[in-house]
A protein has these predicted regions:
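Amphipathic alpha-helical scaffolding segments comprising HEAT/armadillo-like alpha-solenoid repeats
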Residues: 773-784, 803-815, 835-859, 883-897, ...
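C-terminal segment of N-terminal export signals and the immediately downstream linker at the start
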Residues: 1, 21-52, 56-58, 373
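Eukaryotic acidic, Ser/Thr-rich intrinsically disordered low-complexity regions
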Residues: 990-1018
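N-terminal Rossmann-like FAD-binding beta1-loop-alpha1 element of flavoenzymes
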Residues: 51-72, 416-437
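Structural detector for internal amphipathic alpha-helices that build alpha-solenoid repeat scaffolds
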Residues: 791-802, 812-816, 821-836, 856-883, ...
Length: 1018
């Protein structure tokens, strides 16, 4: 359990400092005339380079590579979860200009005709990796760092790891609207109100015409060589020859101003005008030739551009020598910009700017003092900004930068804000807006529905499918009942229909939608969450609300506000398997499980995206959301346990019903499962979640939905299913609206009145209206279970539900029984609970084994039932008694292990020996680690990760090997170590790109080093 200290930040505020004209959304900000306060704080430095490139366009990558070849140290950060955002994000892949193949990068991408997004993205990844250039995805710039002489000295970026500083001598701004140059104080023309011209590309649709809407069908069709089979097993795809027409629409959209809210609405208008039920794909981004150009050091007025001789000062802001604008926002004529914005045309300019930026950096000394300037304004909303400022990883921080106290603009005020438009978030926005609340839903993706749509899990696996979920399923099906794309059952769907269904439901109810927005923090006053701090492509600000619904899936906003949370740490490395799928147009179900991914660790997310493109390099495209089944979870007023689920616990404040088997995708940790494994996939459990489990302890004005809710990790497999979370989100949206209308804090809404409404639509069974808490079980019931437990562990869930009284009843029965077999049952249960009562019986039972029984290897997809053998459980139970007398017995079997032995046997030995913690256990563990193939599975860098990751979409070999090495190394370290091998393994994994291994290894080193160190939040 962690508590993230409440950090009062000041970052994006400086993004709004330099000049009143620094932001495209300045008009909207001026009208609001409200600001939020950020106290002084320190921003961790993640990178210190010569050249930082902001943006992941083709030209941006070309600039980064050329700067590196010129001797500069370079870092690049992309806005999207991929590189090539100028062509892949806008879907502008078509070109007739052969001159773009004059550059090597252009030739690789376009030389063989119309490229696939996968080819573009992977080519750009490899261009940076091959040149040893660090880069990240999904990060927005929020601030400019300023040197002691007042010049730009780098940037601050924001992502799901928080905010980090990047110190740099020169900046290449390759964002479409030159947002970094604007932050640095560069001057731009005016973005006039009225009709503005945008372009938007879709795939598979019928050509439409309407006032202000014209379209052209590209001559060359999109060709798919593979099609998804929709199966979890096998490769998941088959060979095919499928072709789609692509349409580029030109749209005249009425823009109120150049504010972010205007651009967000423009995207929704474009989708309103172009979507139809035959659409199989669409661009993420609107394309516009920016009308408000940079005021540069030079002006290019000609229509034609000579790529070799155009003066680079056209791309430099006036009076700012170390910033370049590498986009259509440069000081170009409209015709010249239009020419350069054709796919690939800017590559050569990027190369020239990269070389020049490196040369300028070579003339500049490193700044001794770098900071983020603040600005004070009036009309401040009381409160302060809470955010996560731990760096990409604490161990990688390269110092800190002071961010002066400042103010952030209020970008909007709503009754309800939903941060995250995924499985629970989109329904929450529907629920709130349909109740009449002024609602805003924000999402980093450019579509709603989360894992069930963009995440490519387009069919249900179990789940409570009544209630609001049934309304959704029927609504999606009825969008076009006779369309041949229609699915056969309500349990699966056309992914873009569901995305569009949620979008229309929210807009029809009056709700607002902002895509392409990161939630980076919370605005808090005395424990009351008053709004969400957001990073947009145009800068950073605050959106205020009466109630915030945190549907990020990782409790990002709640944790930023100060909530405690649980995740992998020094005590636990258990996490459900994850994947990242390929994505062809019209795919709806590409379920993968080949790794672990920590969504909140941007290095890990980056690693997963890079590797996934290698695994699926022949496919049309890669997914945009990691398929994670388990994430960090906040600590709420109540935490749902495994035994609450197994015992059918009822609550007076039930908010959602959940129906599923224990789909664990890996091994479990709760002692109950070590004794009585989860049932097979066909055995479903009906479980309930109380409203208290969605309310972060100690905070008001916020509720958390989905995977970020307060529950033990082993309970999550039952309560994470999509149908259940859709119902949950809708209910919480209703609750948030009611809280506003009654001027209440959401914690105190009339839950019984809400339950009645949910019962009416069948989201909840009627009995919840009269349910009371059925915990704890009576002692009489526990005693009865203690007698029956000897019969195949009958009643074990009752005994362990109330652990303290359960131990008492078990101990009594252990001493009363004269039956040796029964005595062993009690001894095994008590041992698992850390009680030493039956240690002799456990040792005797283990000694009856000459060799190992049938064990278990790590399994992700399709993992049900036991993850340890009976002998494994005896050994773990013996170890947990902490009796040293068990060591010879455990070591005897440890010496029989071979590299081919099952993973569960290694894990059992490790847990037993490390729990006893005696130095006698060290050498046997060392001997195991010295066996061939047991060590050497760390992935410290991306090239190693690419080399070690097999191609299969459900690979488990890397996890079996890495987990085995890490768990054995941990146990060796905790037994006192041998030849420093345990320490070495933990240190190696503390640098692993895979976030959960990093967290675990780092946590073990901190918790068990015996040395007092500065506390670092992991």
């Amino acid at each position: 359990m962690k508590r993230r200290n409440f950090i009062k930040t000041t970052a994006a505020g400086s993004a709004f400092i330099m000049t009143s004209g620094a932001f495209a959304f300045k008009n909207g900000v001026t009208q609001s005339k409200k600001y939020c306060y950020q106290s002084e704080r320190k921003i961790p430095v993640a990178y210190d380079v010569d050249v930082v490139v902001i943006g992941g366009s083709l030209a941006a990558v070309a600039a980064a590579v050329e700067a590196k070849k010129s001797g500069a140290k370079v870092f690049l950060t992309a806005l999207e979860p991929y590189l090539g955002e100028d062509v892949c994000g806008t879907f502008r892949l078509w070109t007739n200009d052969n001159s773009i193949t004059n550059t090597q990068l252009g030739k690789i991408i376009f030389g063989n005709g119309l490229p696939t997004p996968m080819h573009v993205k992977r080519t750009l990844d490899n261009a940076l990796i091959d040149n040893n250039i660090d880069f990240l995805y999904s990060s927005y710039v929020t601030d400019i760092l300023t040197s002691d002489n007042g010049q730009p000295a780098g940037v601050v970026i924001s992502n799901r790891s928080g905010r980090q500083a990047v110190v740099a001598k020169t900046i290449i701004d390759a964002t479409p609207r030159a947002m970094v140059a604007r932050m640095a104080g560069a001057q731009f023309g005016n973005y006039t109100s009225g009709k503005q011209t945008f372009r938007f590309t879709v795939l598979g649709n019928h050509l439409k015409e309407a006032p202000g809407l014209t379209g052209k069908i590209h001559d060359e069709q999109v060709q798919l060589k593979f099609a998804s089979t929709g199966n979890t097993q096998g490769s998941g795809f088959s060979e095919a020859d499928i072709r789609y027409n692509a349409i580029e629409y030109t749209i005249q959209i009425d823009m109120k101003d150049g504010s972010w809210t205007s651009f967000a609405e423009a995207e929704q208008v474009a989708r309103d005008l172009t979507w139809d039920s035959d659409q199989v794909e669409s661009a993420d981004l609107l394309f516009q030739n920016p009308p408000d150009k940079l005021v540069g050091q030079k002006r290019w007025n000609n229509a034609e551009v000579d790529l070799e001789y155009i003066n680079l000062k056209v791309f430099q802001p006036r009076k700012i020598e170390n910033v370049f604008v590498l986009s259509g926002s440069a000081n170009l004529s409209e015709e010249a910009a239009e020419s350069l914005l054709q796919p690939g045309k800017l590559i050569r300019i990027g190369q020239r700017i990269g070389k020049e930026a490196a040369a300028i950096a070579g003339t500049l000394a490193s700044s001794q003092t770098v900071k983020i300037k603040g600005i004070n304004r009036e009309n401040i909303v009381s409160g302060d900004v809470g955010e996560i400022l731990e760096g990409l990883r604490p161990s990688l921080n390269m110092g800190e930068v002071v961010a002066e106290e400042t103010t952030l603009p209020v970008l909007g005020t709503y009754d309800v804000i939903v941060m995250g438009g995924g499985t629970a978030g989109a329904p929450a926005a529907v629920g709130a807006s349909q109740q009449g609340a002024k609602t805003l839903v924000l999402d980093y993706m450019h579509g709603l529905g989360g894992m069930g749509t963009l995440g490519m899990i387009g069919k249900y696996y179990h789940g409570y499918r009544k209630g609001y979920t049934n309304i959704v399923d029927l609504g999606v099906k009825n969008m076009d009942p006779d369309n041949p794309r229609q699915k056969k059952s309500l349990g699966e769907w056309v992914f873009d229909w569901k995305t569009e269904y949620f979008r229309k439901e929210i807009r029809n109810a009056g709700g607002d939608i902002w895509f392409g927005v990161l939630g980076t923090g919370a605005y808090v006053e005395n424990g009351q969450v008053k709004g969400v701090v957001v990073a947009t492509p145009e800068g950073r600000g605050v959106v205020l609300a009466h109630t915030v619904i945190d549907s990020t899936g990782s409790a990002d906003i709640a944790i930023a506000a100060g909530a405690k949370y649980c995740s992998t740490d020094g005590l636990s490395v258990a996490v459900q398997g994850a994947g990242l799928p390929f994505k062809n147009p019209d795919d709806f179900y590409n379920n993968t499980d080949w790794t672990f991914i920590n969504d909140s660790d941007m290095l890990d997310v980056w690693r997963a995206f890079v590797i996934a493109k290698d695994k699926f390099k022949e496919q049309y495209d890669i997914g945009k959301i990691p398929q994670t089944r388990e994430r960090r979870r906040m600590i709420g007023d109540f935490t749902v346990s495994v035994l609450d689920v197994y015992n059918g616990r009822t609550y007076p404040d039930t908010i959602s019903a959940h129906f599923s088997s224990f789909d664990t995708h890996g091994f479990t940790e709760d002692p109950f499962f070590s004794l009585k494994p989860p049932a097979h996939s066909g055995v479903d459990v009906l479980a309930f979640v109380p409203f208290r489990a969605l309310l972060p302890k100690g905070l008001e004005g916020i509720a958390v939905t989905g995977l970020g809710a307060s529950a033990h990790r082993d309970a999550m497999p039952v309560i994470r299913m999509q149908p259940c979370l859709q119902n949950q989100g809708y209910a919480v949206g209703m609750a948030a609206a009611w809280a506003k209308f009654n001027n209440q804090k959401i914690r105190y809404i009339d839950i019984k009145a809400l339950q009645k409404e949910l019962v009416k639509i069948e989201s909840l069974p009627e009995h919840v209206l009269t349910d009371v808490d059925n915990y704890p079980p009576s002692y009489e019931k526990i005693q009865q279970a203690a007698q029956s437990v000897v019969n195949d562990l009958e009643g074990l869930e009752t005994i362990l539900w109330d652990k303290e009284r359960g131990i008492s009843a078990l101990t009594d029965q252990f001493h009363l029984t004269q039956n040796d077999a029964h005595k062993l049952v009690y001894a095994r249960i008590l041992g698992m609970l850390g009680e030493s009562t039956g240690w002799k019986e456990l040792i005797a039972a283990i000694d009856t084994y000459d060799d190992w029984d049938e064990g278990w290897n790590y399994t992700g997809m399709g993992q049900f039932g036991q993850s340890i053998s009976y002998l494994d459980s005896l050994i773990i139970a013996a170890g947990r008694t902490k009796r040293k007398e068990a060591l010879p017995t455990i070591i005897r079997l440890a010496e029989k292990l071979t590299p081919e032995s099952h993973f569960s046997h290694f894990r059992a030995v490790a847990i037993a020996l490390e729990t006893i913690g005696d130095p006698e256990g060290a050498e046997p563990l060392f001997r195991i680690l010295e066996m061939p193939g047991v060590r050497g599975h760390v992935m410290p860098d991306i090239k190693t990760a690419k080399k070690l990751t097999p191609a299969h979409k459900n690979d488990v070999s890397t996890r079996n090997k890495s987990l085995r090495e890490l768990i054995l190394g941990r146990a060796l370290y905790k037994c006192g170590d041998f030849n420093g091998v345990g320490n070495q393994i933990l240190n190696d994994y503390s640098k692993d790109l895979r976030g959960h291994y990093y967290r675990h290894a780092s946590g073990v080193l901190q918790m068990f080093s015996g040395q007092k160190k500065v506390e670092v939040e992991l």
